[in-house]
Amino acid sequence: MNTIGLVVNSSKGDVAKPVREVISWLAEQRIKVLYNEESAVLLGCPEEGISTRELGAQCDCIMVWGGDGTLLNCARQTASSGTPIFGVNLGRLGFLTEIDIPDLRERLQALIAGHFYIEERMMLEATVIRGGQVVDQAVCLNDAVVSKGASFRMVQLRILVNNEFVGSFAADGVIVASPTGSTAYSLAAGGPIISPDMEAMLITPICPHSLSNRPIVISPQSKVEVQVLPYVDKVGLNLDGQYGLPLREGDRILINRATVKARFLKIQKTGFYDVLREKLKEWQNGLD
């Protein structure tokens, strides 16, 4: 482990001091640290920043300071390089960010000593076809969501799986999620929880007008097609709640398992069900 990339969500409070301390400690261990652009600005050296995508190409692993959202963004941008990432938690307990700042130095010592393993997560690829032409294509880790956005009107959608008609319905939208994404928006919309070590896809309608429209778990080899039917107001595609694209009547959105995977560097054995149990307690008790 010679070079570590650094991605910091600078909106998560005053983190510059602990970040600098970790960088200094890594330098003592002869570990080189590269920064993405936002992190370089935070540290007062904007000229040294490179894109997160470039970090993936130049580093052995990437250390992400933030919450699950920051980690999702990094996973999308570095998926093509296959560089493993790990999260330092700056907020509430997350499903993906597993290291707290007080434990970080101990975990980094284990990392440098080679005491880690790589956990791979299935990703999705979404392709937007308009007038027979591909107008956008991107990968996501959690979910691809076709929804009405800020409009008050429902959208009319048609769903096919492997070119087989599943159904048409009026709803606020539809979520196509990975197992990792099953504990995100899909769960709030009534979808089931899928263990992240499985490979599957999940189709979850968002507030459908009919009670007969239920979530469906399908094979990871499946190809999902969402068609935007006439008489829609405003509808858009959103990936991981971060990357968005306005859609038009007649657009076809194709969603399938991506050829790349998110790779998480695990320094400690954290059980998914331990984290799930704590998150469910948190949601039950409400947020402060």
From Swiss-Prot:
Pfam families cross-referenced by the UniProt entry: NAD_kinase (PF01513), NAD_kinase_C (PF20143)
Keywords: ATP-binding, Cytoplasm, Kinase, NAD, NADP, Nucleotide-binding, Transferase
Cofactor or coenzyme needed: a divalent metal cation
Class of enzymatic activity (EC top level): transferase
UniProt key word ATP-binding: yes
Gene Ontology annotations for the cellular component aspect, listed alphabetically: cytoplasm
Function, in words: Involved in the regulation of the intracellular balance of NAD and NADP, and is a key enzyme in the biosynthesis of NADP. Catalyzes specifically the phosphorylation on 2'-hydroxyl of the adenosine moiety of NAD to yield NADP.
Protein name: NAD kinase
Gene behind the chain: nadK
